[in-house]
Amino acid sequence: AKLIQRANDILIQSLRVRLFPVTAPPQPVDADFQLRARLLEARDPDLFERDPAALLRIFIVYAQHPELAGFEPTTLRALWRNTIHIDAAFRANPAHRALFMTLLRQPVGITRALRAMHRYGQLARYIPAFGRIVGQMQHDLFHVYTVDEHILTVLRNVRRFTVSTLAHEFPLASRLIASFEKPELLYLAALFHDIAKGRGGDHSELGMIDARRFCRQHGLDKPDSELVAWLVEMHLVMSRTSQKEDTSDPEVIAAFADKVGDPHRLAALYLLTVADIRGTSPKVWNAWKGKLLEDLYHATRARLAGSDQAMANIAAKQEEARINLALYGLPKDAADALWQHLDARYFMRYSVRDIAWQARMLRWRVTSPDAVVRARLSPVGEGIQVLVYTPDRSDLFARICGFFARIQYTILEAKIHTTRHGYALDSFQVMDLANRGIHYRDFLSFVEYELARDLDPARPIQPVPRG
């Protein structure tokens, strides 16, 4: 398929030049290349045979000129014909290795240049391990791209974090990468994170070995090489932890923080993880997964900063929540009646938005003998968020889960907390996976009323439908 694609490109460009000949003189770029009608052209047809380093330099020039639409057909044919010169000796040449790293350090055009290298065969020749996964399908429920396309999509996603005009898409990722001194390390991790798929064995460990070797060969010092290798080895850990473990559990956060080690690695892993999930399929990423990752990042960051920083973060959350409550005309002490019964773990688990909402909903019900149920549209993504506050008892969780099972709603997240005075303060993120088109305003009232009825201890536990 790639061969057909390359031949097709050459044919189309050749026909375009013949049908629409360019009369304007070319614009010189340097001693080797020039621009002709938005196409990049080698000034000497024998350039690549005479100077094989130009096989890499042409892509640096291509990255530096975003106005270019492609390559002049004669140059494209010469590029394709001379790709055979990218062999073991070529890859071992320090000058060529320096050129590849220069490409990865360009301020713009990196993704476009690497996609062109892939399209015309140079990337697979320069990184043989990449050549082995070209066109390789991934037989799982999530990946919709071949391994090579997935890798380049992940790299593109990392690059998008650096674009200031797109900062609104992922504000945290944008802030983190802006302070990342060497973003090329992230690009290398993206290139190698799945490069060992299909070999047998753990592709994370095999890819780590490839990445470490490549980095050391390309002049990266040991700390930088180890960071890239570590990212490749650990690239699945953050997503698994955020989606499969209780990240409100301090022991889970402590274990994850031990694996990460320091804030710099945490930031790098977060950036790669977000880019990786988004590059799996257009349907896999959602706002809920984004929130899980952000929560894990912030909790781990606080853990790495130490207990003093954690307490400072709690105080900051409380102050911000008070400001939020003031927007509803509530006094500064409106939350005190509830907060006096809550420990530090509660404030570490919840966002400011959730803390303020729960305080507002429970202000006059802190010692209510009856169950309090409040529901709202989820502030992150689809579905609804349900707050349950009631004197704690042993059958409470079973009753709540049974209710959502009966109305055919899936529980995406459950946060269970017990106050100092013996009340359960539980929060549920639920979603109608069947997309039945329910009118949410009426449905929120239904949940608040019916779930509160089901939690009446005088009522028997309702049966859960089977099948």
Residue positions per predicted region:
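Divalent metal-dependent catalytic cores for phosphoryl transfer on phosphate-bearing substrates
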Residues: 1, 6, 146-147, 173-306, ...
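Regulatory modules associated with amino-acid/nitrogen control
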Residues: 1-44, 110-112, 120, 251, ...
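Non-catalytic interface/linker regions that flank or bridge core catalytic/transmembrane domains
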Residues: 1-143
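Active-site-adjacent "gating/activation" loops or surface patches in catalytic cores
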Residues: 27-41, 50, 119-139, 145-190, ...
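Short acidic (Asp/Glu) and glycine-rich catalytic loops that position anionic groups and cofactors
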Residues: 34-39, 76-82, 91-97, 129-137, ...
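Short helix/loop capping segments that flank catalytic or ligand/cofactor-binding pockets
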Residues: 50, 66-70, 124-127, 163, ...
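Conserved catalytic alpha/beta cores of large enzymes that bind or transform nucleotide phosphates
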Residues: 83-104, 159-165, 177, 215, ...
